[in-house]
Amino acid sequence: MALLLALSLLVLWTSPAPTLSGTNDAEDCCLSVTQKPIPGYIVRNFHYLLIKDGCRVPAVVFTTLRGRQLCAPPDQPWVERIIQRLQRTSAKMKRRSS
């Protein structure tokens, strides 16, 4: 199991992933999105880049624990699961600090 996890991480870090490009004056936009699921445990936070923001490709931009930004399609179930997990974690932390 550990070997499978190590191999999965190796493939993830060595394969090219869609990244941000500075083509929009207002904000950086994604040129494409990855269809390959990103492991949720490597994601620190996220934000949306949508057509209404001036981007041609709607995307959720995940920031990894190492600071890498990965573009993902907002309508995919795996993307929604990661966002829900991040929101639950954020809500728990806010309750603890209150």
UniProtKB/Swiss-Prot annotation:
Domain of life: Eukaryota
Quaternary structure and interacting proteins, as annotated: Interacts with TNFAIP6 (via Link domain).
Molecular functions (GO terms): CCR chemokine receptor binding; CCR10 chemokine receptor binding; CCR7 chemokine receptor binding; chemokine activity; chemokine receptor binding
Similarity comment: family membership: Belongs to the intercrine beta (chemokine CC) family.
Functional description taken from the UniProt entry: May play a role not only in inflammatory and immunological responses but also in normal lymphocyte recirculation and homing. May play an important role in trafficking of T-cells in thymus, and T-cell and B-cell migration to secondary lymphoid organs. Binds to chemokine receptor CCR7. Recombinant CCL19 shows potent chemotactic activity for T-cells and B-cells but not for granulocytes and monocytes. Binds to atypical chemokine receptor ACKR4 and mediates the recruitment of beta-arrestin (ARRB1/2) to ACKR4.
Cross-referenced InterPro entries: Chemokine_b/g/d, Chemokine_CC_CS, Chemokine_CC_DCCL, Chemokine_IL8-like_dom, Interleukin_8-like_sf
Lineage of the species this protein comes from: Eukaryota, Metazoa, Chordata, Craniata, Vertebrata
Disulphide bridges: 29-55, 30-71
Xref: CDD domains: Chemokine_CC_DCCL
Tissues expressed in: Expressed at high levels in the lymph nodes, thymus and appendix. Intermediate levels seen in colon and trachea, while low levels found in spleen, small intestine, lung, kidney and stomach.
Pfam families: IL8 (PF00048)
Keywords from the named record: Chemotaxis, Cytokine, Disulfide bond, Inflammatory response, Secreted, Signal
Location of this chain's protein in the cell: Secreted
Protein name as annotated: C-C motif chemokine 19
Residues of the signal peptide: 1-21
GO biological process: antimicrobial humoral immune response mediated by antimicrobial peptide; CCL19-activated CCR7 signaling pathway; cell communication; cell maturation; cellular response to prostaglandin E stimulus; cellular response to virus; chemokine-mediated signaling pathway; dendritic cell chemotaxis
Organism: Homo sapiens
GO cellular component, one term: extracellular region
Keyword presence, Secreted: yes
